[in-house]
Amino acid sequence: MDQLDATFEANLHGGLDSIFADSIHLSFKGDKVFDGNVAIYYPILLDSLYVHANCKHLYFDEVLFRDLLNQLDIKGIALPLPLTNLKHIHYVGDIDGRLEDMQLHGAFTTALGTMRVNGLMQIDTTLQGANFKGHVSTNGFQIGKLFNHKDLGNIAFDAHIDGSIDSTQFTHCIAEATIKKVDYLGYTYHNIHLDGEWNINEINGTLSIQDDNIQLNINGLADWDQDDTRIDLEIQLNDFSPAALHLTEKNPNLRIGANTYISLYTSGTPQEMLDNLNGYVIVDSLKLANNDENYTIEQIKLLIDSEIKDNCPYHQVRLQSDLVTANLSGTFTYAALPTIAQHITHKYLPLLVEKPQVKYPKNTNLDFYAYFRQLDQLTNTLNLGIDIPSYPTIKGHLHGQDVQIQAFVPSIKTNKTQINDITFALHNTNDEKLNLSLYMLTHLPQDNPTAAKLGDIKARIHVSAYDDN
């Protein structure tokens, strides 16, 4: 080990059980590391010594840390990424306690901002983890740069925290915090309150946002441990303006409100979780207000059921609302649906898709339908530039390799064009020929001379594709 390149100056005095060092000046490789006063109290057992330090200047950065380890010939230790992103840490305040168990009262200034603390800090002897319990506040800290999140900016908050962190992430945190402001996607949110517990695989608590462009209250639990996942949430949303929050550029005057209840449960491996999903999502009184248009959906109910029938996975997904009634049911696995689509496409249009390596799934039988209504009210409220005053429908099935899809839209209107009687049908015959049919009647705008000469246009398309052809 090389000679340690450090200088130390202090006025020392004390007795058998204590040492006092006043006017300390500590430098490492010419850079000032510490100025202040330290009192060390130690009983017979040296491993339980107690330190009180009044820090007028305590400085730390990655270069200093790395140089110190090199001079001490210590290998295999690296700073956690969040600490590296801080660039440097300058602490002014008091430190009381044992080396691994310290009470802090002061302020940390870093390249990302200043954080005031008053609490107990416990540091892992390997420097790969830490725990803090106490009060933390800041008037401005660049949290996005701390965690390498480009959409996050500055944050100002006041919080009581009991949390742990390892080399890469938070592992546990109990917190009650008031976030006075935080930047996300270039918008500054105000008046956010958090109260809950966070673990690696669980969040349980409440979130409240009372901002000019969103009033949101979330209460509940999300638990995603190794074997089971459960989500139980109650969400109240009012005066939500997606455009004002920079979530979209469309419909700048749109305001949304709703009450949502979510209860979902699943289990198994990540590949099995979707096939084991059960529960519901209920949206009450979804209200859309956009300029002079208002639209309300009294209730949207999504019901998800999964079980095993005759040794096969059976699923039923039902969607019920003022807007749409839909159902998907049968024996299948969600993971197999892309493979089925690849097989069918390759069978009739082999130039488009390569033959899948996975065999066609057995025991696949599913039926589906969807009936829509009141779509014109929704499209008018959202300024989509299209009206659907009629009641579109779609239905079909997949039984083994037998495919059938039918869709009918009585009418679609744009500003100047109307299309009537849109009929779409796709089915295969005896598992050999795939037939596609499309019919529509188009009324062109009469204020256009060319369109007026053409009049109405009827279109009929019929296409057949044969197996391996």
Show which residues each predicted segment covers.
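Interface amphipathic segments
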Residues: 1-469
